[in-house]
């Protein structure tokens, strides 16, 4: 039990305190991100996926706001707003966990059980000298049991982020 508590505190320190100094040393710009990948890739209702996202460069504590939307080839879409946290492994490699609640319309695709869906994810990106990023992202969408029907879905995307300022 003590080992689990110690592990929790080390993880907490790394995510919240060390990331502040890493992200604070960067002059991050606002980013416009485009992505393409697969929706529900680990299930029988796989569809193509396209994503568009605005990522604000200003930090509020360790977090940066984002807003975006995705549409799949089954005419379903998810519009969301949330937070991200850049964790720099090196000057060029960035890992970014994110969380965003949003509104979901299924189209002809998978029924996720509720109009409100929460997107949690992780992306890994290579940051170029001009601030642009090339990356890969994985996400899970779920209604967090707001409805009895809560199958969730997984997505993955290849992304390109363009610095805006």
Model-identified regions with their sequence ranges:
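Outer-membrane beta-barrel architecture
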Residues: 51-55, 82-84, 123, 159-161
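Outer-membrane beta-barrel initiation region
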Residues: 22-56, 163
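Outer-membrane beta-barrel strand-turn architecture
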Residues: 56-60, 73, 87-93, 127-130, ...
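Solvent-exposed loop/turn segments connecting transmembrane beta-strands
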Residues: 38-48, 69-80, 107-115, 145-153
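Outer-membrane beta-barrel pore domains and translocons
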Residues: 35-39, 55, 70-72, 84-86, ...
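Outer-membrane beta-barrel "beta-signal"
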Residues: 48, 125, 151-165
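Repeated loop/turn-to-beta-strand initiation elements of outer-membrane beta-barrel proteins
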Residues: 30-32, 59-64, 91-95, 130-136
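Cleavable N-terminal export/targeting peptides
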Residues: 1-27, 165
